[in-house]
Amino acid sequence: MKVAIVHNDRVTTQVAVRHLQVLLAEKGILQDQQHPDLVISVGGDGTLISAFHKYKQQLDKVCFAGIHTGHLGFYTDWRNYDMEKLVDALASHPVEENEVGYPLLDMKVTTSCGEKRFLALNEASIKRISKTMEAEVWLGGERFENFRGDGLCVSTPTGSTAYSKSLGGAVIHPRLKTLQLTEIASINNLVFRTVGSPIVIAPDEWITIVPKISDRVVVIVDGERISLTDVQKVDYKIAAEEIRFYQYGHHHFWERVNDAFIGDR
C-alpha cells in the first residue's frame, strides 16, 4: 500500500506528521505523493478538503483518512494521539475492504465562452458582487421560482453541517444520495417569491440557476472563489464520482453532530 500525506503548517501538525512518517516506515508502508492508494490529511476539515481537491482526478483510485490536530472535525476520524492505532489498522485491515463512499456535487457553469465543470466536497454557492442577485431557479428541468437575495447555496450531505447549516439548512446523513438548496438572505415581494425553506432533491434530479444579470456573478466552490465572466446558468447534480473514506474506526455520524453542536453526551 502507498500513502500520501497532506497537512497544514501548524507546529503541532508538523510534529504529528514526522511521527506518522516514522510509524508508516516501521510497518513497511510506502509513501507516494503522486499515486497513493490512501491519502492521509493531518490538520482539520479544511486540510482534508484541500487534499480532496489535490487528488480529485484520482478518486477512482484513492481513499481518504483524516487526522485532526486541532478542533473537532467532521472528516477527521483520528486524533494525533491515535496515530499508532491508525497505522496498525492500515497494516491489518486493508483499505479496499474497509471503505465507505459519500456523494459529491457536480457543478457545470455555462458562460459565453463555453462550459466549465467543478467538483465540490461540501458546497458551491453563487452570489453577485456588491448587489442583490436575481435569478430563476429550475428543479429537474422545470421552472420553480424567481429568487432575489444575497445568493444561493447547493450542498452535499457531508457539507450539510458546514455553510449550509449556518443558512438554516437541514443536517443530512452522508449516506443519502441527495443535494440541498438553501437561500442566502432572500427577499420576498410581489415579484420575487421563494419557498423560503431548504429544498432537498432526489438522486436523479438536478438544480439550475439562471442569473438575471450575468455579469459580476461570483461562484464559490468549497470556500474557493472562482473568477468567471458572463455566467449564463449553473447546473448542479450529484456527481458520478464519489469520495471514499477509510471506514475502520469511522465515527458514527450522529455522534459527530452531537459532539460538534450539542456536546451533552
Swiss-Prot record:
**Where does this chain mainly localize?**
cytoplasm
The entry lists its GO molecular-function terms as: ATP binding; metal ion binding; NAD binding; NAD+ kinase activity
Determine if Isomerase is one of this entry's keywords.
no
Give the UniProt subcellular location, in the record's own words.
Cytoplasm
Q: Where does NAD(+) bind?
A: D45, G46, N122, E123, R148, D150, T161, A162, Y163, S164, K165, S166, A185
**Which family does the UniProt entry place this protein in?**
Belongs to the NAD kinase family.
- Active site per UniProt: D45
- Enzyme Commission number(s) from the entry: 2.7.1.23
What keywords sit in the KW lines? ATP-binding, Cytoplasm, Kinase, NAD, NADP, Nucleotide-binding, Transferase
Among the GO biological process terms of this entry, one is: NAD metabolic process
- Protein name (record): NAD kinase
Q: Which SUPFAM superfamilies does the entry link to?
A: NAD kinase/diacylglycerol kinase-like
What species does this protein belong to?
Lactobacillus delbrueckii subsp. bulgaricus (strain ATCC 11842 / DSM 20081 / BCRC 10696 / JCM 1002 / NBRC 13953 / NCIMB 11778 / NCTC 12712 / WDCM 00102 / Lb 14)
> What's the cofactor?
a divalent metal cation
Any idea what job this protein has? Involved in the regulation of the intracellular balance of NAD and NADP, and is a key enzyme in the biosynthesis of NADP. Catalyzes specifically the phosphorylation on 2'-hydroxyl of the adenosine moiety of NAD to yield NADP.
Matching PANTHER family: NAD KINASE
Give the UniProt entry's GO cellular component terms. cytoplasm
Q: Please give the catalytic activity noted in the UniProt record.
A: NAD(+) + ATP = ADP + NADP(+) + H(+)
Checking InterPro entries in the record gives: ATP-NAD_kinase_N (IPR017438), ATP-NAD_kinase_PpnK-typ_C (IPR017437), NAD/diacylglycerol_kinase_sf (IPR016064), NADK (IPR002504)
